[in-house]
Amino acid sequence: KEKYPEVIFVAEVYKKDLYSEYIRTVGFDYLYDKSGLYDTLRTVVEKNADDNGMPVELWQSATGITRNWQFLSDLQPYMLNFLENHDEQRFASDFFGRNAGNTFAPLYVSLFLNTAPFMIYFGEEVGEKGMDEEGFSGRDGRTTIFDWWSVDSIIRLRKVIESGAYRTLNPDELTKDGMTREEAEIFCRFAEAVRLASSDSAIKEGT
């Protein structure tokens, strides 16, 4: 860090009582808030998508979200918020949110709650379901990191990026370049939220 101060170091720390030590003593720039905001939002989503008998006190959104930001206090800017990564099941998979259209409520919380950065996992912005049955991983709601694999939604997204059509945020233009209608609508809504979070000073800087 002393030699290359521009390098950003992110750590996975799953014990919340160690958050402060890893930021203030060890010196990481950001920590995955997996055990905090991610787990809180996941319980809310799963309870609403599939009533699995979870006790009501564990999934009430206002209570859980409030409890997490109060715990973090001045550590909030050092968290890395996310809804998907290589370890967790895809939001739109049958094992989590079941439908990419359900992503927006937790997305808005992750983006707008504080000034912490937000990580986008590839394909999340088009609602990739992660339901392919890959060789090693199998159908587990994740995009494999162990197999030589091709993801159809990513192929379609790449075509849109290469053509420049993504700049329009127009579903009709995106479908012309090969996206499905659902992917195009998810992408536009997702991009609008990210653009707002990165441009509005009240959200970006908390002022």
Regions found by a protein language model. Give the residues of each.
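A general structural signal for short secondary-structure junctions and capping/turn motifs
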Residues: 20-22, 69-74, 109-113, 136-137
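Short, well-ordered coil/turn segments that N-cap beta-strands
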Residues: 4-8, 26-30, 75-80, 114-118
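Active-site cleft segment of glycoside hydrolase catalytic domains centered on the general acid/base Glu
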Residues: 1
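Intrinsic-disorder-associated interaction segments
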Residues: 34, 51-58, 72, 179, ...
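Loop/helix patches that line or flank the sugar-binding groove of alpha-linked glycan CAZymes
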Residues: 8, 14-15, 39, 53, ...
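Conserved N-terminal glycine/acidic-rich loop preference
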Residues: 16-37
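Aromatic-lined glycan-binding groove of carbohydrate-active enzymes
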Residues: 28, 53-88
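Extracellular glycoside hydrolase catalytic/binding regions
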Residues: 30-56, 96-98
